[in-house]
């Protein structure tokens, strides 16, 4: 087969069993009933139990995607894991996935692209499929509950745990695939885990809160996320000479309902075409798009020829958009 493009061949997702309703967090933070939903659109999120690991959640989503694709596991040539919460700083977690999933001929690498991680992995996977003619497993997973600082309201109300996965396979059809990324490192510190890296390494005297997530300026995050997601989406649509009305389904990063609404308004994609899993699963960073994609495919299977738009923005600040055809 002459490989002309890549195609979405399989979808998977996984979430922990534990449901954390807003009432539990509102009581802990001393917030009035309904405060979280009014400001974020979130009603519930999933948090992992202490004995659950990122690798287990990622493997569950990946196993579902591989089964859905119906591709021999020995054919998978590369496994990419987008995560901000790997099992360990070293070694990477992706090789463990390939071991558990019996992907004997697959390379493996972790990607740290924050909320945009899945899009970076998707673009790299597309390039690999086109160059090598072999399928790639892309997984995005996070256990953000392990990084929440319950003393900081801005981040405590948003984040959940989830995993999503897709298999990208070679296609003889010339399916459209366009991408655009935007980075603004001047806002590098808007969302961060202050310590734990080489700049501020672990030391016993450091306060435990330094190893948890902090987001001190929610307004600036909102403004920058909308700018990046909207700008990247508009650029990728312009590159494809496509009007926003031609998009069949829009999969925005599920950061906050206000961000999703504003991006839809700005780029001109009808809100009804935008996936919405935020209410039930919260913000799981890079995992939100493949989670939404897998759930949407279960509810209403993707049809050949559909045009999909993905957009994300997150810590760094970094973000982007991908336009692809099923």
UniProtKB/Swiss-Prot annotation:
Active site (catalytic residues): 115, 253, 283
InterPro entries registered for this protein in UniProt: ACP_syn_III_C, ACP_syn_III_N, BioZ, Thiolase-like
Pathway assigned to this chain's UniProt record: Cofactor biosynthesis; biotin biosynthesis
GO BP, one annotated term: secondary metabolite biosynthetic process
SUPFAM superfamilies given in the database record: Thiolase-like
Pfam families (alphabetical): ACP_syn_III, ACP_syn_III_C
Coiled coil stretches, renumbered: none
Domain of life: Bacteria
Listed GO MF terms: 3-oxoacyl-[acyl-carrier-protein] synthase activity
Entry EC no(s): 2.3.1.-
Region listing for ACP-binding, in residue ranges: 254-258
Disulphide connectivity of cysteines: none
Reaction catalysis annotation: malonyl-[ACP] + an acyl-CoA + H(+) = a 3-oxoacyl-[ACP] + CO2 + CoA; glutaryl-CoA + malonyl-[ACP] + H(+) = 3-oxo-6-carboxyhexanoyl-[ACP] + CO2 + CoA
Keyword terms of this UniProt record: Acyltransferase, Biotin biosynthesis, Transferase
Protein family: Belongs to the thiolase-like superfamily. BioZ family.
Function: Involved in the formation of the biotin precursor pimeloyl-ACP. Catalyzes the condensation of glutaryl-CoA, an intermediate in lysine degradation, with malonyl-ACP to produce 3-oxopimeloyl-ACP.
Protein name: 3-oxopimeloyl-[acyl-carrier-protein] synthase
Lineage, top ranks: Bacteria, Pseudomonadati, Pseudomonadota, Alphaproteobacteria, Hyphomicrobiales
